């Protein structure tokens, strides 16, 4: 169990788990490589997943937006996340939500390039 971490889930009308995401209100608990765990005044999101059945329904967007709102509620100035080239659908979603590439957050893990993104929240 991590301090100020939450697992948010999406449940369909017929009570099926169709998506989930992990929100971190304390970047020290974010658990990634690179400098992300040292970032101040930020929330993090990880491990967005949506079932094949629910893809294209806005489930992933709703889960990410819920995390963004949690970050706003904490008064954080930005939200941090990581993804890889293999996650092109998620990458596109993050960009549509306003996340921008943040090369200072990039790192390599076991030979895999991991790309950092940041969403600046502005006035909360």
Label each region the model flagged.
Residues 27, 52-54, 91, 103:
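Activation segment
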Residues 50, 56-69, 92-96:
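Conserved acetyl-CoA-binding loop-helix of GNAT-fold acetyltransferases
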Residues 1-47, 51, 64-66, 70, ...:
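Acetyl-CoA-dependent GNAT
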Residues 44-46, 55-61, 83, 114-119:
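Low-complexity, flexible helical/coil segments
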Residues 57, 73-77:
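Short coil/turn segments at alpha/beta junctions that flank glycine-rich nucleotide-binding fingerprints
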Residues 8, 77-80, 84-124:
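C-terminal "cap" of GNAT-fold acetyltransferases
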